[in-house]
Regions:
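Extracytoplasmic "Venus flytrap"
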Residues: 36-49, 72-73, 158-164
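N-terminal twin-arginine translocation
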Residues: 1-9, 14-29
Length: 228
């Protein structure tokens, strides 16, 4: 039995994956259906990537993995529910950089992001993309920054306070030196919907959830947070 909850985190490496069969055999794991918690809304970048990874993992382990979405409070609500589960490896948490940043946004967390979890499968990175409504007429980030400075009333959407999308947009705001009001939602899909509707000026969202909307011409991409 593990002494800490199992934690699936988004990172740049996947070296822990090959060790899974040996670990499972040694501990006779799993013995029943596995629950994988995604602490953000269905359709969010983390949800999309999590489902892609859980499918082959389920086949490899020979056990069903049921994904549960419980968004809100920058991922801390769903994460807190995992802490309360039996620490036997049958409840997994699929998280991202928001996990380590949570204490900065929520000083009174009911759990410790480090001590209460064991990171077992780092499996990828999701670059953020800055997107706006096509009607804005922006072609570059410089266009957005110039308009924001001139307006003084810009808004940006995120998947919640303390989410990776929140920090990405806030970093862009600080680097650009303009003021903008943060409008948090329970998940990325809601944030993208508001930008598409023109009710919020921009968002820095995970590429996996924003890309289909960019390809359909519903959003315009201004910048990507990677070299790709």
């Amino acid at each position: 039995m593990t002494t800490r909850r199992t934690f699936l985190t988004m990172s740049a490496a996947a070296l822990a994956m090959p060790a899974l069969p040996r670990i499972a055999a040694a501990q006779k794991y799993p013995t029943r259906q596995i629950r994988a918690m995604v602490p953000f809304a269905a359709g969010s970048s983390l949800d999309i990537v999590g489902r892609i990874v859980m499918d082959p993992l389920s086949r490899q382990l020979g056990q069903t993995i049921v994904i549960e979405n419980r968004g809100g409070a920058g991922g801390t609500i769903g994460t807190a529910s995992v802490v309360k589960a039996e620490p036997d490896g049958h409840t997994l948490l699929i998280q991202a950089s928001a996990h380590s940043a949570a204490p900065a946004a929520y000083p009174k967390l009911s759990y410790d992001p480090v001590r209460d979890f064991s990171a077992v499968i780092p499996f990828g990175t999701i670059p953020n993309v800055t997107v706006v409504h096509p009607g804005r007429g922006f072609k570059t980030v410089q266009d957005l920054v110039a308009a924001a400075k001139k307006s003084g009333k810009f808004t940006y959407a995120s998947a919640g306070v303390g989410s990776a999308t929140h920090w990405a947009a806030e970093r862009l705001r600080l680097a650009g030196g303009y003021d903008a009001v943060h409008v948090p939602f329970k998940g990325g899909p809601e944030a993208l919907t508001e930008v598409m509707a023109g009710r919020v000026d921009f968002t820095c969202m995970g590429m996996s959830s924003a890309l289909p909307l960019i390809r359909d011409g519903k959003l315009v991409a201004l910048a990507v947070s990677s070299a790709a």
